[in-house]
Amino acid sequence: MSVLNGKKILLGVSGGIAAYKTASLVRLFIKAGAHVQVIMTPASKVFVTPLTLATLSKNPVYSTFYDTPEDVSAEESQLNGEGVWNNHVELALWADLMLIAPATANTLSKMASGTCDNLLLATYLSAKCPVYFAPAMDLDMYKHPSTLANFKALHEFGNTIIPAESGELASGLSGEGRMAEPENILAFIESDIANKLPLKGKKIIVTAGPTYEAIDPVRGITNKSSGKMGFVFP
């Protein structure tokens, strides 16, 4: 059984070509037994549709602070009390872990500096759960000093960076910067969580069967335990 079974995962999708991989990522999380909620930046919807991710996650996809009827402007909707407020604090508190994938250079920079101009950024600032980043950008952007400084800042905040992989990039160049494959992201997160489990690396002795405590040389106290409970443990 996956360590993600029953976990609530908040997936943040930013606007990069690697966003198309998030469909596979959502499917993998669902197969692992996780509950998935998706937040998309406005730019990410150019690369993958909210309908796709909503269908796969079986949950509505959030993108803006305020959902309004299609035929009404946001200003009119708010004045008339129509529409639905997407509470970023509730979304953040719901999650057991948060993953930003793909994490573009722009989104990384904003999160490292505390910028809060869309629903995903506001939710990140409200998150109390472990946060993972799967960067996706061109080689020179990935190696740029400002990007490296943002990685360092996010790491110091307690976040985890999933290293980008090498290969052909959208620019036609080849090198580091492409987002890790969905299977590798899943494996990375599962391994990271497993390594942080409270009993990881502990040596445990399991006893089974009845116990006997002497009262004196003649009498003693015992029980009729079968030991079955102890034998259940691997």
Predicted regions, residues:
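A cross-family phosphate/adenosyl-ligand binding-site feature
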Residues: M1-V131, D138-G227, F231-P234
